[in-house]
Amino acid sequence: MSIPKNVLLELAETFEKFNSCNLNDVYINLFSQQLLNLSVTKEHGAIILSPINDDIIYNKSLNIVKEILEIKGLSNIKIINQKKDIIIFFNEIIKTIKEMLEGKIAVFHKNDILLKGFTLTSYMLQLHQQVQLILHGRLTTYKIEGLDIVESNILNFIENNKSKVNKDINGILGKDKAILQYLIALTMSTPEYDTHLHTMNEKDFEYLYLHIYTLVDLISKRELITSKIFEEINMTVTDGEFIFHDKNWANILNEFGETFVDERISTPNEGFPNIINVLKKNFHKALGFNFDNLEKFITFEENLLPKQEKQLCYPFFKDYLITLMTEHTGCKKDEAIKTIDYYTLQPITDKDLYFESIDKFEYRLLEKPLVPIQIKGHILYLVSIPLLLNAINITYHKLIYNLIPECKKDNSKPIQKIIKNDLVLNVADIIKNYTVNYLCNAKDFTIYDNEKQKKFSFTSEMDVIAIVNKTLLIIECKDLQYKYTPFGYRKDIQKALKYINEISSEMLEIKDNINIIQKYFNEEIKAIIPILLFKTHNIVYNSPIDKKGVIITSLHKFENNLKSLMNQ
């Protein structure tokens, strides 16, 4: 492909501006303030990590909100059990910050922000991975090649203060990802001003990061307080600061954070070799390209580039990207195009989405890692190995949990049959240590009544039933697709309420026909306990929702539940 000279000149100019601004130092300072309560400064060639009494980012964010509330006359108000009013209140502040961000973004060259934001997100993913591996004891700082002195100091501090960092790490990393994804999304949908455009510098980036941090934090607070995690949704604003009046606020989030850390360490990675090929085949049929194309494609870096030339961002014109895809995956051109199109980030057209959690965005950089930029009418794609690897993991996760809309129909049955049954069998392995009277996938029963054989079928299949201490346990297993975000908490609670209602309906039929189960096991039943069991820990456990007598637990805690029952 022959590239016009003016395109090459603008491309060179764009990358020259990019290389003249190093955002990594600004970013890692902001990151350190959240994670370690440390400020990173350079003095006389040395790196100084200074403890800070208050979270600098939090205070700056608070000041942004205070200024907005003061202008709008909302600095001192009280909202009591009015969900609608709380949503209106938060959305008014979110709208103002969004408009401030759009006004700021519009004066910059769009390609400049996209290139810098894209590369920084790639850098962020590398840093996050290093932090997680160090915290889990699978990596030490001295084994990481190519660290500069700032990164080395930060990671060393994390390595030596694991207990301090570990509790809050997932919330901080999640917010960090949300901020940079939000920046890219808002930049793509914000038109440039027709007047003279500027290049984003370090100070500009800090402004954008802090304001998006504030916006993401407000969306999170709104989602939390209006979900059903808390008994009351009373809120007071005093001198611009929010006070939530609910005794569960700190208890639930602290307990959840600690348990999540425990289970994250102890729960093995998911692996379903018997089913993954079936799911991938259906993926290919639905979307027109091989699931493994992206993983094969990333070998281009090893095959084409010497180690010293590897970088966080590669720009490719689409024709060349298609050629690389066909060469490294062995697929045909039309399949390469479908792969590229599927993983290409698109602008968000629904502006109301910017009032929602990043989880709800249809197009997110971490899922759609190919970012197109326009130069003189030509499309150039930004490509990053860390982002591609991250997208592969997300796509795999969504495939296993049947969250890819195009694949849902064909993949529902194999997922239900194999993946869910894997959890059922795990539960049965625990139960058999406490009773011989248990049954998996219970629906059809054959009993003998007065020496006559009788068959009975319940309307719904029960995942596991067991009799322990003359108590019938009705266990429903749910391999929940959980997300550790406020929006994720809301979705988890909505799903849990649905499951609780289903179990409550089933209980009526079970109670009416309890004699069938007693005769089947030849054991008296004096009580019935319904149990909703999730594969991992969940925010639902300690929330004040009406559980209708259903015990909610996890696979991790189930054996303790059984031991308690045995001791009654």
Which residue ranges define each predicted feature?
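Short, well-ordered alpha-helical segments
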Residues: 417, 421, 425, 429, ...
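Short phosphate-binding/catalytic loops that engage adenosine nucleotides
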Residues: 436
